[in-house]
């Protein structure tokens, strides 16, 4: 019998090719910091709600912080056989504090866990992108001012069409990036709801406090529908950039 978490009915080991295909750790290791933040908020909520003892909560939180330090110090070993970031962290936590680590998964699924991780990841990245956009706009605006009367060819259909100034051309990017900035800042409102507590898809019978865990993680409120909470990934589209700047990089080669 396989020792995989989901392989109770399997009698043989999984094919190596399927192992490679199924493992997401090569991508979701980036979620490690957020995964630990989510776990700490969740276990604190369980203690507040009386689902676990305060002493158990403290032990698990201390263990999670040790795992986080190992990751930050570059000493943590990400294992493909454990598939994803959640199981990698939980496995290491079990090694550090013992079987009590299993209580971390009470009233929670990897489904609501990863959905919450992704939102925290996006919120941080979007805030960083907005700062970069503003810096870029300042640089472009200054360059536009310095080159307000520099003549350059304007293109339509990848062909030279009309004379324009370099300043005018650079300011078009300032406007483009401004729309990106508005779109990104607006998306933060839609990301400001926590999926945590939705469990696999239908919630949990444990007396949890989703409002509390949401506030611990900095969210305004929990998501209203548990199915939507674990299944929606439209939030990933919020960071899609405008393709214009990439498209225009081809223009100089068409002259």
Positions of predicted regions on the chain:
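Intrinsic disorder/low-complexity segments enriched in polar/small residues
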Residues: 69, 248-249
């Amino acid at each position: 019998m396989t020792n995989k978490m989901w392989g109770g009915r399997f009698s043989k080991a999984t094919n190596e090719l399927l192992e490679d295909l199924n493992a997401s750790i090569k991508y979701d290791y980036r979620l490690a910091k957020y995964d630990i933040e989510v776990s700490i908020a969740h276990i604190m909520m369980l203690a507040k709600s009386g689902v676990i003892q305060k002493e158990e909560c403290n032990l698990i939180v201390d263990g999670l912080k040790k795992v986080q330090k190992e990751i930050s110090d570059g000493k943590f070993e990400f294992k493909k056989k454990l598939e994803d970031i959640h199981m990698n962290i939980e496995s290491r936590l079990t090694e550090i504090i013992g079987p009590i680590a299993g209580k971390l998964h009470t009233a929670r699924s990897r489904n609501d866990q990863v959905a919450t991780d992704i939102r925290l990841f996006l919120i941080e990245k979007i805030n960083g992108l907005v700062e970069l956009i503003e810096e870029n706009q300042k640089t472009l605006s200054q360059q536009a001012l310095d080159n307000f009367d520099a003549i350059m060819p304007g293109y339509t259909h990848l062909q030279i069409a009309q004379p324009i100034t370099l300043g005018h051309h650079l300011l078009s990017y300032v406007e483009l990036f401004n729309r990106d900035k508005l779109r990104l800042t607006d998306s933060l409102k839609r990301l400001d709801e926590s999926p945590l507590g939705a469990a696999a898809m239908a919630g949990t019978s444990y007396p949890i406090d989703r409002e509390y865990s949401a506030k611990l993680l900095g969210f305004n409120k929990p998501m209203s529908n548990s199915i939507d909470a674990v299944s929606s990934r439209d939030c990933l589209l919020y960071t899609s950039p405008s393709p214009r700047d990439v498209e225009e990089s081809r223009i100089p080669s068409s002259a």
